[in-house]
């Protein structure tokens, strides 16, 4: 194996390791360390704010992750 691959494979995620919301076609990967909810709510709201019916599906896992 390539030495660089061995080094970086710790941070490589396959498609089945991500959380996928298939009804909207968007995929989200929750692999970051715990930060404040404000760091996640703001980007999600700015990216998907016009899709109000899916906004709850995106924000609930983020908020529950903080508990």
UniProtKB/Swiss-Prot annotation:
Topology within the bilayer: Single-pass membrane protein
Regions crossing the membrane: 12-34
Keywords carried by this UniProt record: Membrane, Transmembrane, Transmembrane helix
Subcellular location: Membrane
GO cellular component terms listed in the entry, alphabetical order: membrane
A Pfam family reported for this protein in Swiss-Prot or TrEMBL: SBF_like
Principal location: membrane
Entry protein name: Uncharacterized protein YDR182W-A
The species this protein was found in: Saccharomyces cerevisiae (strain ATCC 204508 / S288c) (Baker's yeast)
Lineage of origin: Eukaryota, Fungi, Dikarya, Ascomycota, Saccharomycotina
């Amino acid at each position: 194996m390539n030495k660089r691959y061995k080094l970086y494979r710790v941070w490589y995620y396959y498609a089945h390791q991500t959380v996928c919301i298939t009804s909207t076609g968007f995929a989200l990967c929750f692999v970051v360390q715990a930060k404040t909810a404000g760091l996640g709510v703001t980007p999600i709201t700015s990216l998907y704010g016009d899709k109000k019916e899916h906004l709850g599906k995106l924000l609930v896992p983020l908020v529950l992750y903080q508990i």
